[in-house]
Amino acid sequence: MFGFLSKLLDSNEKEVKKYRQIVEIISALDVSARKLKDKEFVSHTAELKVLLSQGTTLDDILPRAYALVREAANRSIGQRHFDVQLVASIALHNGKVAEQKTGEGKTLSAIPALYLNALTGRGVHLVTVNDYLARRDAGWMGPVFSLLGLSVSAIISDQSFIYDPSFENQEALDWRLKHLRPVSRKEAYAAHVTYGVNSEFGFDYLRDNMVSDLSQRTQRGYHFAVVDEVDSVLIDEARTPHIISAPDTEATHKYYDHAKLVEKLSGETDFVIDEKLRTVHLSDHGILKVEKMLGLGNIYENDFQIVHHIEAALKAKALFHKEKEYIVKDGQVIIVDEFTGRLLTGRRFSEGIHQAIEAKEGVSIQQESKTLATVSLQNYFRMYEKLAGMTGTAVTEAEEFKKIYDLDVLIIPTHRTMVRKDLPDSVYKTTRAKYAAIAEDIGESYKKGQPVLVGTTSIDKNEIISELLRRKGIPHNVLNAKNHLQEALIISEAGKKGAVTVATNMAGRGVDIILGGSRKETWEEPDKKKWKKGEEEWQKQHDEVLAVGGLHVIGTERHESRRIDNQLRGRSGRQGDPGLTRFYVSLDDDIMRLFGGEQVAKLMTIFKLPEDVPLEHSMVSRAIEQAQVKVEGFHFDSRKHLVEYDDVLNKQREIVYKRRTDTLEGEDQKETIILNIQSEVENVVHMYSDERERMIDREKILTEFLSIIPFDSASADQLLKQLEQLQTSDEMSSFLKSLVRDMYLSRETQVTPEVMRQVERWVSLSVIDSLWMEHLDAIDDLREGIGLRGYGQRDPLVEYKNEAFIMFERLMTTLDSEISHRIFKVQVNMNPENAQSKGVSLSEKETAVTKALKHMKKNDGAEKIQPVQSNKQPGRNDPCPCGAINPETKQPYKYKKCGLINAPYHKK
């Protein structure tokens, strides 16, 4: 890793120097840009678009485009790009990760690159980490794009907006949100520039591949994306697949039963926890104990579902802790993001873990779910033709960015020299001694008026520090996922003189703490006299905080990742401000306990240090950093492994979604379906024929044929007589294949070609969706158990690839077979008058084929397409409201299995 970093740093300087030369060209165009009238910016944008259409490249027009943006930003929002911000933006245009320190203005840096690439008319995306930032940045930068003649939008959970200067939201408290007008998802994606949350881009991609009509699609391609906080999105969240699911079966008491059962198990004798791998399993003693409590023999042979539920309950008990991995709010278990400290409302742990936690906490258990569609962020963002990113901390993960995403990291110089002091770690033997030292340090800073930001890793530790400060009589603000609604207010005051803020990782990323407190912009205070007075007051407070040393950042423990620690440090020392940072560590901290605290413990023993005396030495800092490098390497391998496995499913997903898109686009499937049915029939004939023995089982051939094309008993008898007159399997196969084609064409004439194309599309979509869903479940089961192959000296990944390939081949074969078996079972009820008006003769000459067609079964195996009258949405396992009957069971189709599940008739 260190060799990789040294190469990176060597090439970094050369690249920055090259980009600075381009910035000089941009700066030379400043004079002409300043002479432009406001209305002329739009015409210059139009000129650049024309140049592109004539073959000029983006690189050719970059200096002119960037000069326009620089001037437009200065005029519209009063912010002019620094040279280093233009360097960062050139890096973004070239598909790199730009590492910019806190306060260097990443939001503004992205604008020139977004503008330049949006000139192609293909749409560009700015990806953020939460709803607030997506809306804020779209509204904040909206005036810049508007002056340049481009549209800008924002997509967040369940809502979309477009920047519209003529629209005003009177309820918006933040001036940057006032001109965001609600629009449809499709209109938001049609904008030149779209800001949005990473998860919503992924979910919209999945939803677009589940629609029943092309007009329902929202996204329009994957041209260029700039990912803000790129390390958080592409690395921290990469291990979490994005899943769209639907309720499967009703929740039962089994989770409560197993939660009670594991409460009787002891961690000392009954189960084994591996905190590094985050796994837990029963010991031999525990297995015997569980079998005795359940009154069963071998639970691993009797019912694997029991083992699954017990292990889920064990994980809920041993690995998932309240106020750390989740909180309970309003009777619901809500996940807390381990990297950002924010609530992930609406997301759920998979594999029954969430239900097991709900049972543990005694709240209502929500239904289990079945995966409808899934994609990892790694594979979603790799679909973009060009990808770039911004963050304050990328260099430690440069190797991963290169190997997985083929992204180079460029370290952007700061606008002003960094003067912050980063003190060495203070290491204590116990957590108690560490907390006492932290409280003492906070007290000293508070006395002299220095603002303090205390970073904790979880809500419970956040509240422990808060209680210590309360006892010492130190006023403070607490920021965690429980009171996230006050975040903006708390952060705006965190830089004031004497302010003490205790926060989780929420304050470690994307947060700008301004010394002296947040200042009012001219947009917020239109009265210039009042604004000037407020500005003078702010400057006075700002200078007072500078005099006492700037923001003091205290980390209460080291995180597994150096990036998260660096993010916390980065809240201090913005834009050349002074600042101070220090981390406090104890031997009880997770990282010391799991990844290398033994070396530090030995040092403390050698020096014979008492509990309340810290160890501060470069050897200690190196030991802690080595522990973090170990963890980062472990997680890198895990994510690389995830990509290798997910790539297998990704290729399959692309093939299935391509087939689904072709179906939606109205590709004529008639000939393909006829050939598939003929192939099915041919296979049936050969299956029940033995030419050598001169044995042909005509009755079984007929039975199988009728499962594809259902006849009434009289027509079936007539068909059997015809089969008995044929001597060889080839004759029989040829006759039945001809019959299939004639019946298909006759049916098409009967219902009209337009309706037949709709039937083909509905049946194909429903079969694809249903079987793809089952395939995802099967692949998930394969993935879970494949690791055991390693014990047999076989490579699990190779085994997974081989078996997944076989399963996929089976899926594609089954798709064709299912469509063949369903297409003739759809009976279209047409109004005779309408049929006549469309030129369909209802009294056409009856041939043997049309006679057989008229006698097809009308109930058994025939699905009648008709409007659903009930307003109640049926459950997945309820009988389908369309009344379709399964010919095999003679029972109504379940809603989830019905061939018409995507037909508009199923909608209210």
Residue ranges and their predicted role:
Residues 1-608, 657-658, 675, 679, ...:
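Conserved P-loop NTPase motor core
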Residues 64, 84, 136, 460, ...:
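A generic structural signal for residues located within well-ordered alpha-helices
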Residues 81, 871-874:
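Residue-level marker of regulatory loop/turn positions in helix-turn-helix DNA-binding domains and
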Residues 110, 438, 864-867, 875:
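Active-site-adjacent structural elements in folded domains
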Residues 327-334, 340-347, 575-576, 583, ...:
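Extended, charged helical/alpha-beta scaffold domains that provide interaction surfaces
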Residues 449-462, 665-667, 692, 721-724, ...:
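Short, Lys/Glu-rich amphipathic helical modules
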Residues 454, 502, 772, 808, ...:
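Hydrophobic, well-ordered secondary-structure elements that form the walls
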Residues 874-880, 884-908:
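A short, cysteine/histidine-rich metal-binding "knuckle" motif
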